[in-house]
Amino acid sequence: MKIAVDAMGGDNAPEEIVKGVSEARKALPDVEFILYGKKDEIAKYMDDFRNVKVVHTDEVITMEDEPVKAVRRKKNSSMILAAQAVKNGDADAIFSAGNTGALLAAGLFIIGRIKGLDRPGMTTTLPSLKGENDNFTMLDVGANAESKAKNLHDFAILGNFYGTNVMHVTNPRIALLNNGTEYDKGDKIHKEAYQLLKNDSSLNFVGNIESRELLNGTADVVVTDGFTGNAVLKNIEGTALSMLKLVKETIMNNGVKGKMGGLLLKSAFSQIKDQMDYSKQGGAVLLGVKAPVVKAHGSSNANQVKNALVQVHEIVDSKLVKNLADYFEMHLESIKQDDVDKENENN
């Protein structure tokens, strides 16, 4: 197995990316890592080059670059060369902690969509505080600002395969993020999406879910549009950090007794922080393209990079992309007919 790594992408690149690759090698002895970036800078942090190949390039897509322009103009950047390697069959997957928009564009324009799928979705794994499973998957969390009901249905299919193949959940419970649990809640798109999900016998659809219930283990896969999903994701992250900060400040401002109590609760706080750390699950996955595309947080450290690379290995090993491609190929005619029927309804 070969994983193409954008060694220059991210706030802490290349140091934390290279160190993360070094850690991942210990867990993944069957993987060859192809690092794209400035060879002399990569060499500073690589103790040895066992199972590692470096492809030198001086060009880098920065966080400030406009995504589509960067993909078109920076042909020799570390991210684009890594994506081209996947397209050409020289690597099985791509990993980057760099510019999210540019990676999405590279996934769409270079690696390409699975035939029969209208729009890919960005998928992330979040912790469940209670329920049958420790985590749940949510998509879309940023690939599409606007979505049609059909897209939300497709996201449910993508999430169902991800839950089954990668998360190893049997018959994942799928819920639609909405402003109420009743079937008739939401706008026209969500009402239509509800019916599509309800009528798809291949999905274990459990109905609508409100955002306040997301972490309570109600569903294994939560479906939403990219704008809402991204806002919810950042809200969860921000709320968790703010609450921990508030508790810490309250303890420190309550004198000796408060500090002693905080010391006694230190282990409990560490457990809570560990449970809420979704970076342990790896990165966000662009589902619906012809090869695994995994995006880690820009501020990822070496351990988080390692976790994401282990996740990439799991995705490739599970043959998730092939299973998705086979599904949409098998249902291509019915998808085309649904599109024709929808167009006739609108005329």
From Swiss-Prot:
Phylogenetic classification of the source organism: Bacteria, Bacillati, Bacillota, Bacilli, Lactobacillales
Positions of transmembrane segments: none
Enzyme superclass (EC): transferase
Record's catalysed reaction(s): a fatty acyl-[ACP] + phosphate = an acyl phosphate + holo-[ACP]
Keyword tags: Cytoplasm, Lipid biosynthesis, Lipid metabolism, Phospholipid biosynthesis, Phospholipid metabolism, Transferase
Functional pathway: Lipid metabolism; phospholipid metabolism
Full protein name: Phosphate acyltransferase
Name of the encoding gene: plsX
Single GO cellular component term: cytoplasm
Keyword Cytoplasm in annotation: yes
Domain of life (superkingdom): Bacteria
Entry's localization field: Cytoplasm
GO biological process: fatty acid biosynthetic process; phospholipid biosynthetic process
Molecular-function GO terms, alphabetical: phosphate:acyl-[acyl carrier protein] acyltransferase activity
Family: Belongs to the PlsX family.
Keyword Heme: no
